[in-house]
Amino acid sequence: MSRHDEIKASYKQLGNTGTLYDGIVTRSTLIGKLLDSLVWGLDKELAAKWIEDALAPIPENFAGKLLEVPVGTGVLTMPLYKKLAGADITCLDYSADMMKNAERRAEAMGASNVRFVQGDVGALPFRDEQFDIVLSLNGFHAFPDKDAAFRETCRVLKPGGVFCGCFYIRGEFGRTDWFVKHMYVPKGFFTPPFETRESLMRRLDGLYSRAEVHTVKSEGIFCCKK
């Protein structure tokens, strides 16, 4: 089995148990709260902070073109997209099962400005300089070809556009690093190598005119301007 297939199989398990995944991300279930505390060292306030910080670069009145990759179940972003009625939003994911959850959520919420595309972040099916914002929440630590993913997300972004989001970075919180190495990587949820705060800053500086990185425990939160 190729690494791509391993990751697809792992995320298929999550896609088929969307409520479990959503509970972990939003801390809305007991297991979600336990994992946030045990694995990530997060309490309620810190968990809310990384989400707020990652989404902060998106203006409240945004009416341009936005690409989210990967969309996952859409639990964090569909409520936002419903409010951005004037925006043209495209959501891409490698896992059809995860994306089905997002599609159902968008339909239930009446987010009619969102379309869904199955695809690979390492070979995005979009033309150059197509989007005003590219958003990526907790995806890069799972992508098999991170170099291609960084190149492609930059390629489809318009000059002056914003690339923002978050993902796991190593070296910030030892307990998280241990769980990632001994549990998340063997299960195929995360794929090494992983960035540090310093290596991520160097990488983004090489691609963008301006880049900012800060952390909430092991969440590396970034905002870049092309």
Sequence positions of predicted segments:
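A short glycine-rich, Lys/Arg-flanked "PGG" loop and its adjoining helix->strand segment in the class I
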Residues: 147-159
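Class I SAM-dependent methyltransferase SAM/SAH-binding core
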Residues: 65-123
